[in-house]
């Protein structure tokens, strides 16, 4: 019998990000109880030797599975030391890979209260509005002008520690272009 290959999208990440992600997931599962129903699986619960952990997030009938890997081939960067993350959406026998932004959006829609467009209508009608979203990573667009005005008027409290974000987990902060300030703002550019 011939070998059959299966292609899987794996986002290369720093191992410290994986450790942070796992500790945030465990904190919100066991201490804050905000990740209710989430299941964390250790590496010894998996049959695959390269899987270091799995997080199963129920989304109604479907579920999101975030797997972290170790011992992969190293990447082109120094910090690509063979660690990665795959994100899978599964419904019964159907499964597909999703990107981190969509994964965060799905988690946001299913689990967390949000200060959204409905809050603007409530504020106009005179109801008390709590201007905070528990899961900011689930927003992938800029809000309307009224939304921005309401958020500027009443500052939201930040939850500590933050909720685990898939986008933050796979974020490539090393390859982002550096932001340099002008001549006045950056002291190294003007010699002081």
UniProtKB/Swiss-Prot annotation:
Biased composition of type Basic residues is found at: 176-186
**InterPro entries in the record:** Vif (IPR000475)
Q: How is it modified after translation?
A: Processed in virion by the viral protease.
Q: Where is this region: RNA-binding?
A: 75-114
| Any one GO CC term of the record | host cell plasma membrane
The answer, when asked if Ubl conjugation is one of the entry's keywords, is: yes
Q: Name one GO molecular function term.
A: metal ion binding
Keyword RNA-binding set for record: yes
Where the record places motif BC-box-like motif is 144-153
Give the protein's function: Counteracts the innate antiviral activity of host APOBEC3F and APOBEC3G by promoting their ubiquitination and degradation. Acts as a substrate recognition component of an E3 ubiquitin-protein ligase complex: mechanistically, Vif hijacks a host cullin-5-RING E3 ubiquitin-protein ligase complex (ECS complex) and the transcription coactivator CBFB/CBF-beta to form an active E3 ubiquitin-protein ligase complex that targets APOBEC3G and APOBEC3F for polyubiquitination, leading to their degradation by the proteasome.
Q: Which family does it belong to?
A: Belongs to the primate lentivirus group Vif protein family.
Its name, as the record gives it, is Virion infectivity factor
């Amino acid at each position: 019998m011939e070998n059959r290959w299966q292609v899987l999208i794996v986002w290369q990440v720093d191992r410290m990000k994986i450790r942070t992600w796992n500790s945030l997931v465990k904190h919100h599962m066991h201490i804050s109880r905000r990740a209710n129903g989430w299941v964390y699986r250790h590496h010894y619960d998996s049959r695959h030797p390269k899987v270091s952990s799995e997080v199963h997030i129920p989304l109604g009938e479907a579920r999101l599975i975030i797997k972290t890997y170790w011992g992969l081939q190293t990447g082109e960067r120094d910090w690509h030391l063979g660690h990665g993350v795959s994100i899978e959406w599964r419904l019964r026998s159907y499964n597909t890979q999703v990107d981190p932004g969509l994964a965060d959006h799905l988690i946001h829609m299913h689990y967390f209260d949000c200060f959204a467009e409905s809050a603007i209508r409530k504020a106009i009608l005179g109801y008390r509005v709590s201007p905070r979203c528990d899961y900011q990573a689930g927003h992938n667009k800029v809000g309307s002008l009224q939304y921005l005005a309401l958020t500027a008027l009443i500052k939201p409290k930040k939850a500590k520690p933050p909720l685990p974000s898939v986008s933050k987990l796979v974020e490539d902060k090393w390859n982002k272009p550096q932001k340099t300030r002008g001549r006045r703002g950056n002291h190294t550019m003007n010699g002081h």
